[in-house]
Amino acid sequence: MAFRALTTKAAARPLLALGPRSVAMGARYMSTPAPQDPKSKAAAILDSLPGSTALSKTGILATSAAAAIYAISNELYVLNAETILLCTFTGFSFLIAKLVAPAYKEYADKRMQHVSGILNSSRNKHVAAVKERIESVSELKNVTETTKVLFEVSKETLELEAKAFELKQKVDLATEAKAVLDSWVRYEASVRQLQQKQIAESVIGKVQAELANPKFQDKVLQQSVADVEKLFASLK
């Protein structure tokens, strides 16, 4: 047991000698150029500790420090390079959590608000479209009555169109009949004119033939002389 303690102490001496140098390097690396208010730094450390009251947080911090001091003083825990690296990594992680977490939280909140706005806008548009569709469908609730009225109107329209077509056929037939009758009348008139012309030409031809006959001329001359003699006799 004593040999193990001596071995542990002998192995720990180089590490303990290296410890202050590593602590100085870590402190130099973690140092900030701008000074920070000790009160605000202490308040930030207390806020990062678990607990609901300042007394409980202070108790946790004091207990942790006392436990660490007791462990190191009794060589229950040896401070070596790994410890310095762990402390440095823990401090760096703590700083990252303190600096990056609020910015990421703000970005996440803005992103969630943007997505929520898009979803709410889409939902409102969908609700408006559904309401508009419902209103358009509700306007068609009397479609049966409207269809009946339109059917009656279309029926009356068909009847009127049938009557109009029938009257048009009658008018077309009457027009055609009138055209046929007019053509027949014109034909009869032309035939009558032709017959009258032929009769007149025949009579004129016969008269001219009689006038050209010497016997007829002598007879007419004798008749004329007799008429003149009768006229003179009546004058005496």
From Swiss-Prot:
<dbReference type="GO" id="GO:0045259">
    <property type="term" value="C:proton-transporting ATP synthase complex"/>
</dbReference>
<dbReference type="GO" id="GO:0005743">
    <property type="term" value="C:mitochondrial inner membrane"/>
</dbReference>
<keyword id="KW-0813">Transport</keyword>
<keyword id="KW-0375">Hydrogen ion transport</keyword>
<dbReference type="GO" id="GO:0015986">
    <property type="term" value="P:proton motive force-driven ATP synthesis"/>
</dbReference>
<comment type="similarity">
    <text>Belongs to the eukaryotic ATPase subunit B family.</text>
</comment>
<dbReference type="GO" id="GO:0065003">
    <property type="term" value="P:protein-containing complex assembly"/>
</dbReference>
<keyword id="KW-0999">Mitochondrion inner membrane</keyword>
<dbReference type="GO" id="GO:0046933">
    <property type="term" value="F:proton-transporting ATP synthase activity, rotational mechanism"/>
</dbReference>
<dbReference type="Pfam" id="PF05405">
    <property type="entry name" value="Mt_ATP-synt_B"/>
</dbReference>
<feature type="transit peptide" description="Mitochondrion">
    <location>
        <begin position="1"/>
        <end position="29"/>
    </location>
</feature>
<comment type="function">
    <text>Mitochondrial membrane ATP synthase (F(1)F(0) ATP synthase or Complex V) produces ATP from ADP in the presence of a proton gradient across the membrane which is generated by electron transport complexes of the respiratory chain. F-type ATPases consist of two structural domains, F(1) - containing the extramembraneous catalytic core, and F(0) - containing the membrane proton channel, linked together by a central stalk and a peripheral stalk. During catalysis, ATP synthesis in the catalytic domain of F(1) is coupled via a rotary mechanism of the central stalk subunits to proton translocation.</text>
</comment>
<comment type="subunit">
    <text>F-type ATPases have 2 components, CF(1) - the catalytic core - and CF(0) - the membrane proton channel. In yeast, the dimeric form of ATP synthase consists of 17 polypeptides: alpha, beta, gamma, delta, epsilon, 4 (B), 5 (OSCP), 6 (A), 8, 9 (C), d, E (Tim11), f, g, h, i/j and k.</text>
</comment>
<protein>
    <recommendedName>
        <fullName>ATP synthase subunit 4, mitochondrial</fullName>
    </recommendedName>
</protein>
<dbReference type="InterPro" id="IPR008688">
    <property type="entry name" value="ATP_synth_Bsub_B/MI25"/>
</dbReference>
<dbReference type="GO" id="GO:0046961">
    <property type="term" value="F:proton-transporting ATPase activity, rotational mechanism"/>
</dbReference>
<keyword id="KW-0406">Ion transport</keyword>
<keyword id="KW-0138">CF(0)</keyword>
<keyword id="KW-0472">Membrane</keyword>
<keyword id="KW-0809">Transit peptide</keyword>
<keyword id="KW-0496">Mitochondrion</keyword>
<dbReference type="InterPro" id="IPR013837">
    <property type="entry name" value="ATP_synth_F0_suB"/>
</dbReference>
